[in-house]
Design a protein with these regions (language model features):
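Structured, solvent-exposed acidic/aromatic patches
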Residues: 1-246
Length: 246
């Protein structure tokens, strides 16, 4: 992997042709922390400290230990960035270490907010520390966005709807939005005709056949073949800061 290749004396000089070894490693560490954050939020206690070493019989780590470890990993990754050659092949930030730093600190803030639900003091302190860096996603130009050119690499929602016609916005949601004249409705789905919740696939297929304007998830502009996917945005960070300020 990127970290091993850029750390191994036999390969690091060759790897450096694609950018600073330190910066390649730092970016990989930030992404690793992000993915393990998703994993532990889904499944709680998971293999972490002994993972990615080629062993299958490894211990599970407590989520209470994983969160601080991920935050520490993000801090260490940011500290590792240097002024070396710009990393090539970076499809997110084109090797821009300032933007990667903003993403890392933004992840710290998001993690800290969730941590505060079980350890208020630790979560508050970590959020404040990340905020104090002044380097986090605060404008849409800094959003963590995955771009899809179409063709062999399509937006996942576009690919999903090539074969699935039974997934849409639930009628409970569209009903609430309609009843409250919710101006955000258009951002949730393609129409106000929601699918009744809990249908089997056959019943859902029958419903959408009888209701051709049923509500796809997201508006069409967000699920075209080449529509980008925003993973973490300045809007999310603004909501996080508002929640932390309560």
């Amino acid at each position: 992997n990127i970290i091993n290749v850029n750390s191994d004396a036999k390969y690091k000089d060759l790897a450096a042709l694609n950018g600073s070894n330190a910066n390649q490693i730092a970016i990989a560490r930030i992404l690793k922390a992000y993915y393990f954050w998703i994993v532990t939020d889904y499944w709680g206690d998971v293999p972490y400290s002994q993972s990615l070493k080629g062993n299958s019989d490894i211990a599970y780590d407590k989520q209470s230990a994983i969160y601080p470890a991920l935050i520490a990993e993000l801090k260490a990754a940011v500290a590792q960035f240097d002024a070396g050659i710009t990393v090539k092949g970076d499809i997110i930030y084109s090797g821009n270490t300032t933007k990667w730093t903003k993403f890392a600190n933004s992840l710290r803030m998001m993690m800290a907010l969730r941590l505060s639900k079980v350890d208020a003091a630790a979560g508050k302190a970590e959020f404040a520390a990340a905020l104090a860096t002044g380097s986090f996603i605060d404008a849409s130009a800094d959003n963590f966005t995955v771009n899809y050119p179409g063709g062999a690499f399509n937006n996942p929602w576009f690919s999903n709807y090539l074969t699935r016609k039974d997934q849409g916005v639930a009628s409970f949601v569209t009903g609430m939005q309609t009843a409250n004249a919710d101006p955000r409705a258009a951002a949730f789905g393609s129409s106000s005709v929601g699918i009744p919740y809990g249908l089997t696939r056959d019943l859902a297929t029958a419903f959408i056949g009888a209701n051709p304007t049923w509500a796809y998830v997201l508006p069409a502009s967000k699920r075209a073949a080449n529509s980008p996917v925003i993973v973490l945005s300045s809007a999310q960070l603004k909501f996080a800061r508002a929640e932390a300020a309560k």
